[in-house]
C-alpha cells in the first residue's frame, strides 16, 4: 500500500515509518522538518505544515492510507500558548481529513489520546476530542487509537521524569510530586508494542469505524514511574509530596510568568491515564507479551 504518515518524523512516526517500510509498504513521511529525521532509505519525505492546507494537500495524492500522528505534548505548555492545541490537533486534523477526502484515500488512522473529550478539562483533551469528531463525521474509513503514555527510544516520557529532579533546587536530588505522585496513574506502553497494532489497523477491514483504548501491561502511579526510572540507573531521589491545592496555585502562577507548565498540567495530574478496557486483544495481543517500563529501562 501507498501510505502517508503525517507527523512521520516525530517519536512514534519514525518508529511507524520503519515498521511500515519493513512490511513492504511504500511510505511517505510528512512533517515541517523532514531533514531532522533518521529514516530508512526507502521512506520518502516531504515538507508541509498541517495548519496550512495548501502546503500538505498534494502529499495525499495517490495514497491508500493516511496516519495522522501530529501532536503537541500535554506535559508542557506549548510555545504560542494553549490555543496551539486547537490549531495543531483540530486544525491539522481538519486539513488532513479534507485532503484525504479530496484525493480518495481509503483508510485514515488518527492517533488521539485517552480521555479525548470536546468538553474535557484541558485544552489538550478538548482539542483531541474535537479532532476525533472531525474524523468520525468524515466520509473516510477511519480508525482511532487512544493510547496511554508511550515510551521508548526518542520519547519524552522518561526524559520528562528526569527533568523534574532538581528543577526547583538545582543540584539537590529532590523530586517534587503533587499529591506525592500517588494520584496520577498511567498504563505506559512501549512504542515497539504499539506500532505493530497501528500497522495492523490498515491491513484489516475489521478495524474500520473502531476507536481503541490502548495501554501497556501494568498500571503505575507517577511515584512508581519515578522510582523505576531512578532505580534503573542506580540512583535515588527524595520525593517531596506537594499538597494538590498548593500544586494548583504554584503551577498556575508559574505558568503565567513563562514556566513551561501551568494550569492545564495541574489538571492533567488528576487524570487517570489508564484505559477502562484495554483493547490490545483486538490485535491478538496479550498483556503478558508486552514490554514493561522497568524491563525497557533495564535493557
Positions of PLM-derived features:
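Residues forming the Rossmann-fold NAD(P)(H) cofactor-binding site
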Residues: 13-14, 90, 129
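Oxidoreductase cofactor-interface core, primarily capturing Rossmann-like NAD(P)-dependent enzymes
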Residues: 118-231
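Rossmann-fold NAD(P)-dependent oxidoreductase module
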Residues: 15, 19, 80, 99, ...
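N-terminal Rossmann NAD(P)H-binding glycine-rich loop of SDR-like oxidoreductase domains
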Residues: 3-23
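A hydrophobic C-terminal alpha-helical subdomain
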Residues: 245-299
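Short, polar loop motifs at secondary-structure junctions
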Residues: 29-37
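NAD(P)H-binding glycine-rich loop region in Rossmannoid oxidoreductase-like domains
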Residues: 35, 43-95, 99-102, 114-117
Amino acid at each position: 500500500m501507498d501510505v502517508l504518515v503525517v507527523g512521520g518524523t516525530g517519536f512514534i512516526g519514525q518508529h511507524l515509518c520503519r515498521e511500515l517500510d519493513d512490511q513492504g509498504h511504500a511510505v511517505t513521511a510528512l512533517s515541517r522538518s523532514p531533514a531532522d529525521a533518521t529514516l530508512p532509505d526507502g521512506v520518502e519525505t516531504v515538507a508541509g505544515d498541517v495548519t496550512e492546507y495548501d502546503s500538505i494537500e498534494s502529499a495525499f495524492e495517490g495514497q491508500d492510507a493516511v496516519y495522522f500522528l501530529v501532536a503537541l505534548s500535554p506535559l508542557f505548555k506549548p510555545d504560542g500558548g494553549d490555543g496551539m492545541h486547537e490549531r495543531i490537533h483540530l486544525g491539522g486534523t481538519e486539513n488532513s481529513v479534507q485532503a484525504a477526502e479530496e484525493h480518495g484515500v481509503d483508510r485514515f488512522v488518527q492517533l488521539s489520546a485517552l480521555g479525548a473529550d470536546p468538553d474535557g478539562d484541558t485544552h489538550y483533551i478538548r482539542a483531541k476530542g474535537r479532532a476525533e469528531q472531525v474524523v468520525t463525521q468524515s466520509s473516510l474509513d477511519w480508525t482511532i487509537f487512544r493510547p496511554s503514555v508511550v515510551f521508548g527510544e526518542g520519547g519524552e516520557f522518561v526524559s520528562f521524569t528526569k527533568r523534574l529532579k532538581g528543577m526547583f533546587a538545582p543540584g539537590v536530588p529532590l523530586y517534587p510530586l503533587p499529591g506525592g505522585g500517588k494520584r496520577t496513574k498511567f498504563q505506559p506502553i512501549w512504542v515497539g508494542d504499539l506500532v505493530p497494532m497501528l500497522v495492523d489497523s490498515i491491513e484489516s477491514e475489521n478495524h474500520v469505524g473502531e476507536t481503541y483504548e490502548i495501554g501497556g501491561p501494568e498500571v503505575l502511579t507517577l511515584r512508581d514511574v519515578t522510582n523505576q526510572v531512578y532505580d534503573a540507573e542506580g540512583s535515588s531521589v527524595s520525593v517531596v509530596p506537594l499538597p494538590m491545592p498548593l500544586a494548583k496555585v504554584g503551577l498556575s502562577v508559574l505558568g503565567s510568568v513563562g514556566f513551561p507548565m501551568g494550569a492545564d498540567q495541574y489538571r492533567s495530574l488528576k487524570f487517570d491515564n489508564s484505559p477502562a478496557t484495554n483493547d490490545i486483544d483486538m490485535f491478538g495481543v496479550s498483556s503478558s507479551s508486552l514490554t514493561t517500563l522497568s524491563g525497557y529501562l533495564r535493557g
